[in-house]
Amino acid sequence: MTTGWKYGKLLKERLMTLEKPGKALLFDADKGLVEEITHKFDIGAVAKSLQDKDEKEAYKALEELGRNLMKLTIELADNKYLDRTGQMIEKVYKQTGISFPHRLGRYVELSVFGLRPTDRWNMTRATTRELVLQVSACSIYKALNEVGIKGLPCKGFCFASFETAADKTGDRINIGMPKTLPENSMCEFHVSVQPGG
């Protein structure tokens, strides 16, 4: 990897320049992405439709919802609402060949933000080997509890969305969940790259 510095001196020929210096660039997710996703997916309605199902059936239904949400997120994030962050992540990937965690993390963040803009969540670790996401206030878990669905069938939703994002980025991943709501006051997901992946 080359840098723009050598022995404390600037090497101008190695510095990356902006395409159009002085032009304002959009780095934040567009509100339209959130509006389109929340318009298409109604968490409350989904929870009510699962009311008479057992945990296994609810898990399968939520897996499908997670896949569909991530597919829509990827479509919107890569086309209609492609922002500067997305452009730069792809540019760096093409230059370095390093996909994980940036590409997968972007899709995960946008899907959480898109469907659940008021949830409390945080990426606590993002290295080339592991991505750790903590969700401490989850509107999906809350909606399921409100209609009397017990257990954690929403785990299927999260796992399926991560796997769909990994399919898009080409990352072979393992997913662990060492902490869960309500016991640990959060769900914590550990997404790691498989050896050789």
Give a label for each model feature.
Residues M1-L131, A137-G156, I175-C187, V193-G197:
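N-terminal accessory segment detector
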